[in-house]
Structures are given as structure tokens and as C-alpha cells.
A protein has these predicted regions:
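Short acidic, S/G/P-rich loop/turn micro-motifs used as interaction or catalytic elements
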Residues: 11-16, 43-44, 142-144, 190
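Short, acidic, metal-binding catalytic loop of nucleotide-sugar glycosyltransferases
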Residues: 20-33
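Active-site-proximal specificity loops/subdomain of glycosyltransferases
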Residues: 38-127
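Catalytic core and acceptor-binding pocket of nucleotide-sugar-dependent glycosyltransferases
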Residues: 103-119, 123-129, 142-146, 167-174, ...
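Short alpha-helix within the catalytic core of nucleotide-sugar-dependent glycosyltransferases
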Residues: 19-20, 121, 144-154
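Short aromatic/hydrophobic "clamp" motif used to bind/position activated sugar donors
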Residues: 134, 140
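A short beta-strand-loop structural module common to alpha/beta enzyme folds
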Residues: 32-43, 233
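N-proximal low-complexity "stem/linker" segments adjacent to membrane-targeting elements
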Residues: 1-17
Length: 248
């Protein structure tokens, strides 16, 4: 039986709305599929917007934790108060493009990815096994077309969406290594390496990787630092409350 780990990280966005989609596309709730999560949460934020610059919904109340326990049935989960990372890399953070994702949001994501994959690794070590496939994704991911069974994917590769590069990727030179930050999967060892972006961030920044997008930093860590074999796919999906459909 193929064993799969779904690893959620980030803010608890659109969890109820995307539940069935994740059941249909990733087997959420099946006996061979386990859930791990590192989620930012502070009940004081209930009802406020996740972000002020783009519409991503509002922070849920504490009842979401009970819902997650009853429906996701996570093997391990950590809720952490949102942290600020603005104090990091104040002198050598180099976007290299006129529009940039907030540094704090980017580093927060790298931190969460590392934390949730570490939870998965702890469970593997405690039970002396490795998952066949590990999926790292946002809670508000909504697939429009089924990506196919995970067993069809080579577990020795990192699987990501095939982004058509825009001028920002082309002119900054990141088109050769950048990978979309919304979702990725592969074998357990592959995803362990994928998750080391936060650990390797000082090295990545010192080597002058453009920092205007987390796609560049994640890809730099995967390809330049960890030498992962990356395979890109023409999946079709969107962020639940977003207007953009990702497709080729």
C-alpha cells in the first residue's frame, strides 16, 4: 500500500471549502493518507483579513481546530502565533525587481514548510518507515483538473507546476531554477531536501539569489543547493478565493 503524507503549512485559509477537493484529488481521509500541519493561528486575529493588499479571506476562530481534529485527523499538528521575520537580512536582501513579495511573508512560508516537514520526519522516525510520497501545499489550494494518481509520479524527482516565465523571471535570470511556491511533491527524502530553504536562507541570500519572489528562493534551494531533479507539469488549479487559474 502506498503511504502518502499531506503536509499543510501557512495560514488556515479556506480549509472547509477545500476539504472535498483535497479528498478527491489527494485522498485526504483515506487510510493510507496521513496529515501533518504547521499553521499560523492567533484567535485575537479572528475576523480580520489575512492580508491587506490582496483578498485571501479572514482569520477563522478557534473552532477551526476542532474541525481539523475531527476531519483531517492529523498525525501531528502545530499552531503557532504569527512571527515577524522583518529583522532578518536587513542589509543584503536583494529583490532585483521593482515589484516584490513582502520579505516577512516569504520567510514565514519557508519557516512553516521546514516545520511541517520536520513533523513528518518525526513521525517517520518514531515508527521506523518512510512515506512513499509527500505533498506540501497550502490549505486553500483547489485543483480544477485531477493531477493523476501520485503513484504515477517518479518519487525520485520533485514535482512542481510548469510556470510560463514572465518578464520578471526572464530579466532577473530566475527562469532556469524558480519553482512555484503553492504546491510540490515527491518522495520523502526529496521533500526533506525541498524543505531546507529556511535552513539554507543565509547561504542563498549571500549568493545573491533574487529575493523578489519566494519562487526564486525555493527553486534556488531545490536546484542550486540540493541538486534536485525537478519535473514540471501542466496542472490546472487555483487558490480558492483567487481569480487566477494556474494552467498551461
Amino acid at each position: 500500500m502506498t503511504r502518502i503524507a499531506l503536509c499543510y503549512s501557512g495560514r488556515p485559509r479556506s480549509i472547509l471549502e477545500c476539504y472535498k477537493n483535497h479528498q478527491d484529488n489527494f485522498g485526504l481521509g483515506n487510510d493510507n493518507v496521513d496529515v501533518f500541519a504547521h499553521l499560523w493561528f492567533n484567535e485575537i486575529l479572528t475576523g480580520t483579513n489575512f492580508r491587506q493588499d490582496v483578498g485571501q479571506g479572514t482569520w477563522p476562530n478557534d473552532e477551526i481546530k476542532k474541525w481539523i481534529d475531527e476531519n483531517w485527523k492529523p498525525k501531528k499538528i502545530v499552531y503557532e502565533n504569527p512571527k515577524s521575520f522583518d529583522h532578518m537580512f536587513t542589509e543584503n536582501w536583494n529583490p532585483q525587481w521593482h515589484q516584490a513579495h513582502p520579505k516577512d511573508n516569504q520567510i514565514s512560508m519557508f519557516y512553516g514548510i521546514e516545520k511541517v516537514i520536520n513533523l513528518k520526519k518525526q513521525h517517520e522516525n518514531e515508527h521506523n518507515f518512510k512515506y512513499d510520497y509527500v505533498v506540501r501545499m497550502r490549505t486553500d489550494l483547489n485543483f480544477i483538473e485531477h493531477p493523476g494518481n501520485l503513484e504515477q509520479y517518479d518519487k525520485t524527482k520533485l514535482h512542481v507546476f510548469n510556470v510560463i516565465p514572465g518578464q520578471d523571471w526572464i530579466q532577473t535570470g530566475i527562469k532556469d531554477f524558480a519553482i512555484l511556491d503553492i504546491i510540490a511533491w515527491g518522495g520523502s527524502d526529496i521533500m526533506d531536501k525541498y524543505s531546507t530553504t529556511y535552513f539554507n536562507l543565509e547561504k542563498i541570500v549571500k549568493e545573491n539569489c533574487p529575493t523578489f519572489t519566494p519562487d526564486a528562493i525555493l527553486g534556488y534551494n531545490a536546484i542550486k543547493v540540493n541538486n534536485l531533479n525537478v519535473q514540471k507539469h501542466p496542472w490546472t488549479f487555483k487558490i480558492y478565493v483567487g481569480s487566477t487559474t494556474y494552467s498551461n
